[in-house]
Amino acid sequence: MRLIIIRNDNNSHSQINKGKEKDIMKKIAILGIILTFFTNLSFAAEVNVFSARHYDSDIQLYKKFTEKTGIKVNVVSGKDKALQKRIIEEGDDSKADIYITADAGRLGEFDAKGMFQNSMTSAIKAAVPKNFRSTNWTGIAKRARIMYYSPERVTANELNGMTYEGLADPKWKGRVVIRKSNNIYNQSLVASLVKNNGKKSTCEWSKGVVANMARDSKGNDRAQILAVAAGEADLAVANTYYLALMLSGQKGEEQQAAAKKVLPFFPNQGDRGT
């Protein structure tokens, strides 16, 4: 089995509103990495992709691949856990050639079960930075988990030098919203803090964040942004692309209007970065 991990990320405020030309170039770049995987499979007439993603852009990439190679792409879509369960249960009889999902946390868990094989090639090493790949999987896009704030209630001075660690600062008491800790995005964020600060420090940090919550954790990432827009909180943690989705109007006028009331902030710019 081969594995591709998909990540989505924007590294600055300006990148949230990419133009069509840059978007097309990004898709072409992603296609190039996917082709690297596909062409390393046996010279088969078709390839089976098990994907936990649900974006039309992926389908367009598969179509381009088929046009380029003549190899048919069969896509099996589903929730991440359901796909993993199926692959495990089918064992050696699984038809999965490539597994696509989001977040390294999910990949680490699945890889620990021995479900992947070495998929590294010189082409992947040349195209993907070392910190975005492992022996058994590679990232082909990235995303950031950032903060969103109300410009009406949060001052520039408060955000000066703001870090993820700063979410535990008592000055944010009753002002922070973030989804539940069982969410994989939050688990990966916590894992990065453990890596950089150690388990003991991160444990104390988590207690501080809970103490600063404006309300009990509930809802998805967009719900956190909506809470800030509604005045229920001043600071939210969510992935970058959700703001872009809301601003696009695809989720309705209410969410579009709410997205215009918040601003994104990229923490830890003074040290390891977002």
Go through each PLM region and give its residues:
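Short, Lys/Arg-enriched N-terminal segments with co-localized hydrophobic residues
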Residues: 6-24
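Bacterial N-terminal signal peptides
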Residues: 31-40
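Early extracytoplasmic/lumenal segment of secretory-pathway proteins
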Residues: 44-109
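Residues embedded in well-ordered beta-strands
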Residues: 48, 146-148, 263
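Extracytoplasmic ligand-binding site segments that recognize negatively charged/polar headgroups
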Residues: 52, 56-59, 95-232, 243-249
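Generic structural signal for residues in well-ordered beta-strands
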Residues: 73-75, 176, 262-264
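Extracytoplasmic/periplasmic substrate-recognition and gating elements
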Residues: 219, 223-226, 230, 238, ...
